[in-house]
């Protein structure tokens, strides 16, 4: 579990949010089924140290303090939403979700692809259609990642959502037939195979014509 410190944000509004960003802080909010929204602020320098290590499925111990540095609450939360500046792509606002025990939650879990497909050795290329898998789960059973082994995939093979191995109690929210990863056939190979099929189909017809002419 990752630990993160936040301070209570007493003043709200767009003007205050801009002021916080200029001073090196990121405005955020904590909420949940049994949690009234709590406006907080986080130092950007602290956030940047851990941001690349967390995902939506990472449990975070959020330590909330007042402006005097006194701890007012400690909560286990998940990063629900990240808002970025359209131009600079810097983080401008965060949403943290505090789940309630017994209340199932929907969350996106990173997909981890392992192995090198045999189809890639033959000239194909691996296409990952979903970098994250949406699931429904209990808060204490959130998987950190969903692993899929693609070693045995040949040209044209597909792993569907129904093929994913999930922990007990975790439900995939994709349609069963949804493609997750596949080894695609290169265009030139596909054209070559199609040409060969056409030639094979035409050959019997040519032989038949010759037989008719000889008769």
UniProtKB/Swiss-Prot annotation:
InterPro entries: Rbsml_bL25/Gln-tRNA_synth_N, Ribosomal_bL25/Gln-tRNA_synth, Ribosomal_bL25_b-dom, Ribosomal_bL25_C, Ribosomal_bL25_long, Ribosomal_L25_dom, Ribosomal_uL5_bac-type. It holds the Pfam family Ribosomal_L25p. One of its GO terms (molecular function) is 5S rRNA binding. Transmembrane segments: none annotated. Keywords: Ribonucleoprotein, Ribosomal protein, RNA-binding, rRNA-binding. Residues 192-215 are annotated as: Disordered. Residues 205-215 have a biased composition (Basic and acidic residues). The keyword Transcription regulation does not apply. This is one of the proteins that binds to the 5S RNA in the ribosome where it forms part of the central protuberance. This is Large ribosomal subunit protein bL25.
């Amino acid at each position: 579990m990752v630990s993160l410190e936040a301070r209570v944000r007493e003043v709200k509004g767009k003007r205050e949010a801009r002021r916080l960003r200029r001073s090196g802080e990121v405005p955020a909010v904590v909420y949940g089924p049994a949690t009234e929204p709590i406006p907080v602020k986080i130092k950007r320098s602290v956030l940047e140290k851990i941001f690349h290590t967390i995902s939506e499925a990472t449990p975070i111990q959020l330590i909330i303090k007042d402006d005097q540095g006194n701890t007012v609450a400690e909560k286990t939360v998940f990063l629900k939403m990240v808002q970025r500046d359209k131009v600079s792509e810097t983080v401008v606002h965060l949403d943290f979700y505090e789940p309630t025990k017994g209340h199932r939650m929907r969350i996106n879990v990173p997909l981890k692809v392992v192995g090198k497909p045999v189809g890639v050795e033959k000239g194909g290329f691996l296409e990952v259609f979903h970098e994250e898998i949406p699931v429904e789960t209990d808060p204490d059973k959130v998987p950190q990642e969903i692993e899929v082994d693609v070693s045995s995939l040949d040209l044209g093979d597909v792993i569907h959502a129904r093929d994913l191995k999930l922990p007990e109690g975790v439900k995939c929210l994709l349609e069963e037939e949804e493609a997750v990863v596949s080894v695609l056939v290169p265009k030139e190979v596909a054209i070559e195979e199609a040409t060969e099929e056409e030639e094979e189909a035409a050959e019997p017809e040519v032989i038949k014509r010759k037989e008719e002419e000889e008769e």
